[in-house]
């Protein structure tokens, strides 16, 4: 019954249907429908043997035939197996390819555990070792020619949307505290108060002696919304959240306050490195208490928990023994260490003109603004896809940099202000993380020595700001400041900031998908309305607002044509603006249109040349910066000034104006020559209009009927007079008689004989000058305007080379 089994198999080949077999007499006379017909030589006449027993069947079949049948059956089974492998699962060829995924992941885990002496048993230890091997390897990744690091295939096995803990060494820490009632969300006029105009200066820091009283209430100027009061009275219970519905709330805040009820928020940690702060507190304020050991002597007296400076010593330094004066000095020192020195370090880091320039340049990449947008357009390369972290450059094409363009008005300003605020928090946290990781025990001991040497100067300083400035000189030296400023900020995208925003909101117990909250909504906008622990966030919010206006990101001032990438900030206007810098515009128009070849030093080597390519021009354009016209600490747009720029406006590569003018004239003459002599239809690359349209064929001139009849009468009279006078006719009609060479057979004057072709078969056209055109008659155009019937196989731009005529 071998044939029946083969028929039931869907993957078995059909060769058995055309092959004769010795047991065909015992098989039923059925064939598959798909089997081809047998040829005449292979047709077997089957006979019905009737009922036979197994013994008779065995005796009737020879032994050699049985062996042949077994061999055929085994061959057919092997063939069926090969057919199943060919037509079935294609993954089982050789080794199972599905095991490669596990093999690769096991190899990565083995590499991660090689540095450990024992194999960790906890999942957290394995995960930590795995993340350190992926994101913090001992050997840094190789750098490619374009500046980015090579792709790491090991990252394919890490969860895509998970935040690795080993990277977020400082970003995962938060300062959980109560939201002040005077936060920005409870100030309906916050957008007007934060608006900056021409002449606004960079914000400054504050101290507790300058702001002695702090108001955290709602204020008299704010009025609750009427529907919020009705809802509170109807429910007969007080509002348990901090956010209050106000009359002047915008649509976003109104929806937010009805969506959530919060009292606390997780503010990103902005503290100085814990190692530094622990050392400063122990040497200046109070001695640090260490955990007790088993063998420690409890009767032994130590300085742990005691003030770093006793009352007797402080009284000798201050030359007073009044308890109130001593207590006031201790409060001043505590405020300077916990609050003001942090603000002092922030201001030194962010307010530096060079650092501010780098911050604004990074914001131009983040928001695809101004000169960065112009460079992307000319180079045809999306430069905003570049992101970096700790000096390593990556190309990420999944990031978004144009999300802010979908917003208008106050919604756009709130979003941009929040993005810049998060960008500053992110940058400061990155700097603090690097600072924390670089410190070792010997550095902390050296810091203790410096603090002990300057202990008296710190406690006897003039005021809180002077104490903070002196302390910042010790713990935040100039070398450390310059090193961090050179490596930061990192290039970020709006997608990265959005992930950071969601990370903060989730840690605060706010679901981002159900509300439209921004982290900056919970930060007060003034120092006198903000608790001192949040003064760092208040300063960063004010600085973010200033940078957003100084970079001209708050409003969209772009337009059409040359104004497509226009930006009013000092980084773009006037030196990088195609609108204000005419030489830069001329240089951008001749990109790729010429190549200057210099004299070769010898006959063998090629001569050095200059070819203005888009890449060369873009590189020089991005590097172009004029510090004389950059006003870091004041909003001073070039458009709002009546004075000329301090530096001369020049191009990027070709800075000599006369050379640039010659190249521009050559390019213009070449384009005009192509329009006149070239073949094809030339299109404007910007508008798409034809630069050399084919004029319509001229229409024959038709005189009015009255003039035509009058002209015909005059011609008939002239012909009769010519026939009367004979050869020569009237004066001035020489050689146009009936018998002259110009006369026709009909005797009419001025009609040359058409059958005769002399040396002037085609006569010149005569143009009458000074004649007043008749009404309705077409004007005669300029003779220098030639008409060409141009044929084109495709649309060509002004920069392409047409076919030679």
Curated annotation (Swiss-Prot):
Biological process terms in GO annotation: intracellular transport of viral protein in host cell; symbiont-mediated suppression of host gene expression; symbiont-mediated suppression of host translation initiation; viral translational shunt
Changes after translation: Might be cleaved by the viral protease.
Cell compartment(s), UniProt: Host cytoplasm
GO molecular function (one): RNA binding
Residues covered by region (Binding to host EIF4G): 280-345
Induction info: Expressed in the late phase of the viral replicative cycle.
Keywords: Chaperone, Eukaryotic host gene expression shutoff by virus, Eukaryotic host translation shutoff by virus, Host cytoplasm, Host gene expression shutoff by virus, Host-virus interaction, Inhibition of eukaryotic host translation factors by virus, Late protein, Methylation, Phosphoprotein, RNA-binding, Translational shunt, Transport
Start-end of Basic and acidic residues biased regions: 59-70, 79-88
One CC-aspect GO term: host cell cytoplasm
UniProt cross-references to Pfam families, sorted A to Z: Adeno_100
Protein name: Shutoff protein
Organism: Human adenovirus C serotype 2
Lineage, highest ranks first: Viruses, Varidnaviria, Bamfordvirae, Preplasmiviricota, Tectiliviricetes
């Amino acid at each position: 019954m071998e044939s029946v089994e083969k028929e039931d198999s869907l993957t078995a080949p059909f060769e058995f249907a055309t092959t004769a077999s010795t047991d065909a007499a015992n098989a039923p006379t059925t064939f598959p429908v798909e089997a081809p017909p047998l040829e005449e030589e292979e047709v077997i006449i089957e006979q019905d043997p009737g009922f036979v027993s197994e013994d008779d069947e065995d005796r009737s079949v020879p032994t050699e035939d049985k062996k042949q049948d077994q061999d055929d059956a085994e061959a057919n089974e092997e063939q069926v197996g090969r057919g199943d492998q060919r037509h079935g699962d294609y993954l089982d060829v050789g080794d199972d390819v599905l095991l490669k995924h596990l093999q690769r992941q096991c190899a990565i885990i083995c590499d991660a555990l090689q540095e450990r002496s024992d194999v960790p048993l906890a999942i957290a230890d394995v995960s930590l070792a795995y993340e350190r091997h992926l994101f913090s390897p001992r050997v840094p990744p190789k750098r490619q020619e374009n500046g980015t690091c090579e792709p790491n295939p090991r990252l394919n096995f890490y969860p895509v949307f998970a935040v690795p803990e080993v990277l977020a060494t400082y970003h995962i820490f938060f300062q959980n505290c109560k939201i002040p009632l005077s936060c920005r969300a409870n100030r309906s006029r916050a957008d007007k108060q934060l608006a900056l105009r021409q002449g606004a200066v960079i914000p400054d820091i504050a101290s507790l002696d300058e702001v002695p009283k702090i108001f955290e209430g709602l204020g008299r100027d704010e009025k609750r919304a009427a529907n919020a009061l009705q809802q509170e009275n109807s429910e007969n219970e007080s509002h348990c959240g901090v956010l209050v519905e106000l009359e002047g709330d915008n649509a976003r805040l109104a929806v937010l306050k009805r969506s959530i009820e919060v009292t606390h928020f997780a503010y990103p940690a902005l503290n100085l490195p814990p190692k530094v702060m622990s050392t400063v507190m122990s040497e200046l304020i109070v001695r640090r208490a260490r955990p007790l050991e088993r063998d420690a002597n409890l009767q032994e007296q130590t300085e742990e928990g005691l003030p770093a400076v006793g009352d007797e010593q402080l009284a000798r330094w201050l030359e007073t023994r009044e308890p109130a004066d001593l207590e006031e000095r201790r409060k001043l020192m505590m405020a300077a260490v916990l609050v003001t020195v942090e603000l002092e370090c922030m201001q030194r880091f962010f307010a530096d003109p060079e650092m501010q320039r780098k911050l604004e340049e990074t914001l131009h990449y983040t928001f695809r603004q101004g000169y960065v947008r112009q460079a992307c357009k000319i180079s045809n390369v999306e430069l905003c896809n570049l992101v970096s972290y700790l000096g390593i450059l990556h190309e990420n094409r999944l990031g978004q940099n144009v999300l802010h363009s979908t917003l208008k008005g106050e919604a756009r300003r709130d979003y941009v202000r929040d993005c810049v605020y998060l960008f500053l928090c992110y940058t400061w946290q990155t700097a603090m993380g690097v600072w924390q990781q670089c410190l070792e025990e010997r550095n902390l001991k050296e810091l203790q020595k410096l603090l002990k040497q300057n202990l008296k100067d710190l406690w006897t300083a003039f005021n809180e700001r002077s104490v903070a400035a002196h302390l910042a000189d010790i713990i935040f030296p100039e070398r450390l400041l310059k090193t961090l400023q050179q490596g930061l900020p990192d290039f970020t995208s709006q997608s990265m900031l959005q992930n950071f925003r969601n990370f903060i909101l989730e840690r605060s117990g706010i679901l981002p998908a159900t509300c439209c909250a921004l982290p900056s909504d919970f930060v007060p906008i003034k120092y006198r309305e903000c608790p001192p622990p949040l003064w760092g966030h208040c300063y960063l919010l004010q600085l973010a607002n200033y940078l957003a206006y100084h970079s001209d990101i708050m409003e969209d001032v772009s337009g059409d044509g040359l104004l497509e990438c226009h930006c009013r900030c000092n980084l773009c206007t006037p030196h990088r603006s195609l609108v204000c810098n005419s030489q830069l515009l001329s240089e951008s128009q001749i990109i790729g249109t010429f190549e200057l070849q210099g004299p070769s030093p010898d006959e063998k080597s090629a001569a050095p040349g200059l070819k203005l390519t888009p890449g060369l021009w873009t590189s020089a354009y991005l590097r172009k910066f004029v510090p004389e016209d950059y006003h870091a600490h004041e909003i001073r747009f070039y458009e709002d000034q009546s004075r000329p720029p301090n530096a001369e406006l020049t191009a990027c590569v070709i800075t000599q104006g006369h050379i640039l003018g010659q190249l521009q004239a050559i390019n213009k003459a070449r384009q005009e020559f192509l329009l006149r002599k070239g073949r094809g239809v030339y299109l404007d690359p910007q508008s798409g209009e034809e630069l050399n349209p084919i004029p319509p064929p001229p229409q024959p001139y038709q005189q009015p009927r009255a003039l035509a009849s009058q002209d015909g009468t005059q011609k008939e009279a002239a012909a009769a007079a010519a026939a009367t006078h004979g050869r020569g006719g009237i004066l001035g009609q020489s050689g146009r008689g009936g018998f002259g060479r110009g006369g026709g057979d009909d005797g009419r004057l001025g009609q040359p004989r058409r059958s005769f072709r002399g040396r002037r078969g085609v006569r010149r056209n005569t143009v009458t000058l000074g004649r007043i055109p008749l009404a309705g008659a077409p004007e005669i155009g300029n003779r220098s305007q030639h008409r060409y019937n141009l044929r084109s196989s495709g649309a060509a731009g002004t920069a392409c080379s047409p076919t030679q005529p």
